[in-house]
């Protein structure tokens, strides 16, 4: 392993995530918060929910009640006046259903004088859920969508129609109370109706689109689930004010600043990356190979969210798969490729992402591992662990997509 490049990678990861932590972002957003004369309630959902809620209560002083639902091991302590729950991700579980039921109970019977502060971050589609269909069927549909390679917009178009809270229905449940929503964006282009499936946003997707997605991926649906795909979601909401705070653009900008501080010339390739993870990794490797003779220290950055089409039964995540796919293409170069999820988790693993450099391919071969066979089995986690290529941050408390970086040293 090239320790100089690895140390640079670790520094870039730390700096980029630090820049998009929710504490200061929440304080900025709440400068515009004007609650009504009645009760002020807090509901927070997503991977960053606990940190967002903690920052909000610290800023406001107190709330009259609240519910937080986030991933397992993401609650860091108690918050005055707020009940905190942990639940399943990326597949919703009974914890998701229970916590969301508590949130719906909390907002029942509100008046026009009351205000709901709704804090939303990525992961909310699984964590904040109360389905019309059975929990078991929703879990099965979610697994089908994850396995078939559907992108996040396609997944959420389906999930909205099966849910009592998605696609604007949570805001409807809060009415006539006002809803002030603060959103950490984890979807390219910041489409409010798609972030966590838009519980407090009018839905721009249509039944026609949902049915087309079900047909495209040959989803196995019950008669009731298929009927629900034909029921339109709310298209207007007059009780919601929304503020977006934090995005993949800020993540990439912070990474670029740190690259420059380390002596690299940063170049942002895109902040709208959306393709197969292994294709992105191979592309970044080809960029490094093309510029290997330039005599410059370069950093190529790409922000967004790739997808993985599952063909095997291994363990990994999209960032680990992206990095591993780059290893053969940079073999022997004074170069590295790494990719990390800003939330600190990548797939169902304890890693945030993966790192490879010009020495990785040889190290894998020495361990009896073939990159292409590992990718076929979707087992990037174990391969990268073998060569110390996992990036582990622990839960970060934020979630604004992923950043991939390709470094080239002279």
Set out the residue ranges of the language-model regions.
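Accessory alpha-helical/coil subdomains and C-terminal extensions
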Residues: 159, 177-180, 202-283, 287
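Glycine-rich oxoanion-binding loops at beta->alpha junctions
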Residues: 71-112, 154, 158-159
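A glycine- and small-aliphatic-rich helix-loop capping segment at beta-alpha/alpha-beta transitions
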Residues: 55-65, 79-84, 104-108, 131-144, ...
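Short beta-strand segments
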Residues: 43-45, 67-70, 118-122, 181-187, ...
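Internal gly/pro-rich beta-alpha loop/helix module
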Residues: 134-220
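Active-site segments that bind and position negatively charged phosphate/pyrophosphate groups
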Residues: 263-339, 347-348
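An N-terminal, well-structured beta->alpha segment
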Residues: 1-43, 51-52
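Internal helix-turn-beta structural module
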Residues: 324-410
